[in-house]
Amino acid sequence: MSTSTFATSCTLLGNVRTTQASQTAVKSPSSLSFFSQVTKVPSLKTSKKLDVSAMAVYKVKLVGPEGEEHEFDAPDDAYILDAAETAGVELPYSCRAGACSTCAGKIESGSVDQSDGSFLDDGQQEEGYVLTCVSYPKSDCVIHTHKEGDLY
């Protein structure tokens, strides 16, 4: 048995897909029979299959330089910049690889995983700076955007 623990504000989205052979009714003069319509392939078995996948979704609030706020849902497997664009929020960016500081922000609350980035040093990350192009949300978070100038 396995156990998973999630943050209390975490939302799980799931996809369930089932596949099974379809059946067709064929009427013969003496009986009504059901036959499975399955392509016959040597050495392959047909069976019901259940695929399940789940992902966590967090609330991300971005606060712009003029105090404007944008809140949207961001899955834990998408960069914050990409999730913002999907939600219709425009943010500055250049490299999309974590190698520059154009998309820099400063996290006020919450946590992110930005292990894909290489531009920010440990001290800047400890001060709360994030690169939205390579940051995955790991909890609900509030990030102040347009912070490239603060890094220098």
From Swiss-Prot:
Transit peptide interval: 1-55
Disulfide-bond pairs as recorded: none
Biological processes per GO annotation: electron transport chain
Binding residues annotated for [2Fe-2S] cluster, in chain numbering: C95, C100, C103, C133
Main localisation: plastid
This protein's record includes keyword Chaperone: no
Cofactor, free-text remark: Binds 1 [2Fe-2S] cluster.
GO molecular function terms listed in the Swiss-Prot or TrEMBL record: 2 iron, 2 sulfur cluster binding; electron transfer activity; metal ion binding
One GO term describing the cellular component: chloroplast
Keywords in alphabetical order: 2Fe-2S, Chloroplast, Electron transport, Iron, Iron-sulfur, Metal-binding, Plastid, Transit peptide, Transport
PROSITE patterns, per database record: 2FE2S_FER_1, 2FE2S_FER_2
Cofactor: [2Fe-2S] cluster
Protein's job: Ferredoxins are iron-sulfur proteins that transfer electrons in a wide variety of metabolic reactions.
Family statement: Belongs to the 2Fe2S plant-type ferredoxin family.
Protein name (record): Ferredoxin-3, chloroplastic
Gene name of the encoded protein: FDX3
